[in-house]
Amino acid sequence: FYNVRANGKTNEEELFANLEPFFEALNLVRFEYVEKDIDLDKVIQGAIRGMLKALDDPYTRYMDPQALKREQEDMFLGRFGGLGIIISIKDDQLTIISPIEDTPAYRAGIKAGDRIVEIDGKTTEGMGLDEAVNILRGDKGTEVTLGIKRENIEELLEITIIRDIIEIKAVKKEIMGKDDNIGYVRITTFNINTEPELEEVLNEFKKDSDIQGIILDLRNNPGGLLDSAIEVASKFIKDGPVVHIKDRDGIVASIESRGNKYPEWPLFVLINEGSASASEIVAGAVQDSGRGKLLGEKTFGKGVVQQVFNLYDGSGIAITTSEYFTPSERSINHIGIEPDILVEPAEDSEQDMQLNKAIQFLEE
């Protein structure tokens, strides 16, 4: 059960008094509404969604049993049918946090920060996150047309994308540089596989005595599990705080690095507007500790942590339970993290200017 706190103590009588108008309204619907055969589960779910929407927090949301199961499978299996985009609600608009690399959306030119204003000609105004995800998901080979508003472009962009099976590999690696001495690591998401996959890659780099520097690519990484972010940051930061987390009572917990066993290679971290949440924890820790340099563009600005609570019927509620701050106690939420070295992508070139710049710095 849940205790309800009022003025620092449990006050169930006050809670039930506040709920009386709700039960009155529910009974009026049950016994006075013109259609007798109403779907009571649907009505209750709508009431829960309305309650959470009143908090004006895009990250606190209700998930019906199907949506909760889907989210858990996405996080732990990393495989689903869809377009390959991570979306959220930002400024009351359906917003793409990031396209997932090597997916239909990525290949179609979808960009972080794009606003989805239409799906198959239907406006997304007032559309909830779960409703949008349900529409965008689908079988391989089916198509959907998105109406996109993009910054600095007046006209509506209509982009048709064919759905596919999206499989997310958390960590990718490559050896780069003219002397093959730069280790490139791309982290696409923070899930239960990220830390062991990164460990394997860094062990390979450690055995290769030629490696003289590391590029950690967090661009278009929308985040994921908090613990995974702490593990990743700890691979590069030997000691000291990785992140501070403040709860509703103002109590701050400082989470320290879990220590690292790797050489302190020169480090560049690539970031952009699609780097969010757990990515910002890692980027902030690297920047504040002085362990490396951030290169690219300002990050998304999601500095809050959600916890999922299961309800008895198999549904769940994701509730924002705390806010996080960088080791130097900077707030990130709605602000983002500025790079140490600003490098904007070349719009009219296939060259990866940010990656090339990081390689150039490491080769100097």
Give the label of every model feature segment:
Residues 1-59, 208-209:
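Terminal targeting/pro-maturation regions of precursor/exported proteins
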Residues 30-95, 143-145, 149-160, 167-173:
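Extended, small/polar residue-biased N-terminal targeting/export presequences
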Residues 95-98, 106-112, 120-123, 128-302, ...:
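Cleft-lining beta-strand/loop regions that shape enzyme active-site pockets
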Residues 332, 348, 353-364:
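Conserved functional hotspot residues or short segments at active or partner-binding sites
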